[in-house]
Amino acid sequence: MKGNYLVIDKRVLPDVYEKVVFAQKLLKDGKVKEITEATKIAGISRSVYYKYKDYIFDFAETSQGKKVTFNLIVKDQTGVLSGVINYISEQGGNILTINQGIPINGVANISVTIDMSTLIGDIKTLLNGLSDIQYVEKIEFVAME
């Protein structure tokens, strides 16, 4: 594996990391032209920005053109798998592998790997949309290449 990476929910990290990403976004979107201005708006020092700017990235921005694997826990209801497949297709996802386990105690596990290079949105949007499908109980991110 190239690099030493972790996927961490931002809720458990100090606010400074999210502020660095916010400053990066201000600069990228052209809302500010100077790093000094971006750091002031974000509420961080320039030294903090420079310390972390090359190591912190928004998950959605780094996810294009890659493969992602996630698991879904779904209720044993007719059409749930079809709904999941249709939604991924509507969002431009290319399903590489899909595996549904035998339902036990009224729920089944679905494991999906997709190529995200053709997604209309980002991975967060896709996973949020999948969680809105009726009878999808839980989604768990497994890995990203």
Swiss-Prot record:
Disulfide bonds: none annotated. Transmembrane segments: none annotated. InterPro entries: ACT-like_dom_sf (IPR045865), ACT_dom (IPR002912), UPF0735_ACT_dom-cont (IPR008310). SUPFAM superfamilies: ACT-like (SSF55021). Signal peptide: none annotated. Coiled coil: none annotated. Gene3D superfamilies: 3.30.70.260. It comes from the Bacteria. Pfam families: ACT_4. Residues 69-144 form the ACT domain. Belongs to the UPF0735 family. NCBIfam families: PRK04435.1. This is UPF0735 ACT domain-containing protein CLH_2637. It comes from Clostridium botulinum (strain Alaska E43 / Type E3). The lineage of its organism: Bacteria, Bacillati, Bacillota, Clostridia, Eubacteriales.
